[in-house]
Amino acid sequence: EQVEQGGVNALTELYVRFHKEAETDPALEDEGRLWFKKIEDGDKEAMEIFTWFKEVTLKDTQRVYDLLGVSFDSYAGESFYNDKMAPVVEELREKGLLIESQGAQVVDLEAYGMPPALILRSDGATLYITRDLAAAFYRHNTYHFDKCLYVVAYQQNLHFKQLFKIIELMGHDWYKGMEHVSFGMVSYEGRALSTREGYVVYLEDLLNKAVEKAREIIEEKSPNLPNKDEVARQVGVGAVVYFDLHNDRNKDIDFRWERALNFDGETGPYVQYTHARCCSVLRKAEAFAAAEPDYSVITDDEAQDVLMLISHFPQVVRKAMEQSEPSMITRHTTQLAQAYNKYYFEHRIMDESDPAGTAA
């Protein structure tokens, strides 16, 4: 009942409690490994508990995905590959890549400047890399991908170097299409997050708080604004997403409210406010423009800057795609918003006495 009501929060509390108690009772770690092996072996009781935990987790995370507007074509988790690991392990064995080390099975990567990759524990249980190998083969055989991107924190750099090298050593050249898109860690208001220590900030709580704070700002600045709840949702969620994507992905970032929700600066709300201003101008322009304007009269530096940034946008998007670096787009968008606002404040727009302003 506590898990059903508490969802991911309750499961996290169990996780923290387990590791705290394991510090004084090492036998818990052994019991945990035993139950993990039971899951891999398809034990009925273990699978019932595992499936229940998974359903509770997916139910909670789906609310976050809905808030972010994110959807997935496949929700295949680690357990999906339980019955797909044996053929991969057998191929490693047939190709002479598996060696025994203290009862465990490893792939020796010393020649490539990496420690051995542990494939099977002494009790036969698998590890992350075993499941990732099975997943890689499944994805290649199912999707025949040109690129397979792993968006995972930079702490896993070694893991993915080992993964890709093992697939290469197995003789499969499609490893060349696999890439680890690493990213930095996030701290909250100056404090590092740690699940094991129990200091976590749930994304759903963060997004809801962002919407709440955005609503307060809107009430203060624009009390007569229609659809305040929807605008608050867009501004709040947008602020969190933009804050994350505005930084180079490999840099650690410290999330702070006063920066994320600032309407003046390199933030989501600033860009959204600028977009709203542009839309307002365009609505007024529909009624104002009686004839096709003469664009050749747009010669001032401010307008030229805006036009240049707009023209460069497709190249920026392509470069961001090639380098898997979304901050290129957010930074360019910020620059465009700044350039537009500079033009907006320094020039008259839709003024019949100023053809350049009307054309712009």
Task: Go through the PLM ranges and name each one.
Residues 1-360:
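NTP-dependent nucleotidyl-transfer catalytic core
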